[in-house]
Each structure stands twice: as structure tokens, then as C-alpha cells.
Amino acid sequence: EPQLCAFLWRKRWLGRWVKQLFIIREHVLLCFRCAKDLQPLLRLELRGCRVAYRAKPGKEVQHELKVTAAAGAALVIGFTSRQHAEDWRKVWRCRS
């Protein structure tokens, strides 16, 4: 059973944003292209990850969380509000 689930913005190559389904289960972040997908596009172990909030006023997506894995890979996720980003950051901190 997921602890948190939502369609969020994911920053892709060349700064383009795509909306994808993110689910946190236990200590793993899963990213799916759509709700019908059975296999995740991305599976990120949250243990050992660092999470940082960044505000980007005047941009298309104004609230971002940058998740950096222990291996060094980074994932940038966009939110519609600061509160929404903070809610996700709290869950990530509990799971990491």
C-alpha cells in the first residue's frame, strides 16, 4: 500500500517538464508514465537520499524538490505549491 501518490511534474532533458505518476512505497520512490503502467519508469531507493527544496519564481513550475540518490543520480520534481512540496519532503525524510 502506498504512503503517498500523486501526478507530479518531472524535469526531463533540456529542462522540459512532463507529468508522471509518483508513488512512495516503504522506502522506494516509483515513477510511472501513466496510471495504467505496470512497470515503473524509475525506481529510486530513498535510503541515503538528500532532498532539497528550490523556489523558482516566474518559471513554469515554481516549486521544485531535487532528490539526489546515494549513487549521485539526481531527480527534479515540480509542484504546484510550496505546501505540496513540503508535504512530499516530509515523507521523503521519514523514508530516507
Please report, for each region that a protein language model flagged, where it lies by residue.
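Polybasic phosphoinositide-binding surfaces of eukaryotic membrane-targeting domains
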Residues: 1-44, 88
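Residue-level detector of conserved, well-ordered beta-strand and adjacent loop positions
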Residues: 9, 47, 68
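Canonical pleckstrin homology
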Residues: 14-20, 51-96
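Phosphoinositide-dependent membrane-docking surfaces
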Residues: 29, 45-56
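A short macromolecule-binding patch
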Residues: 44-45, 76
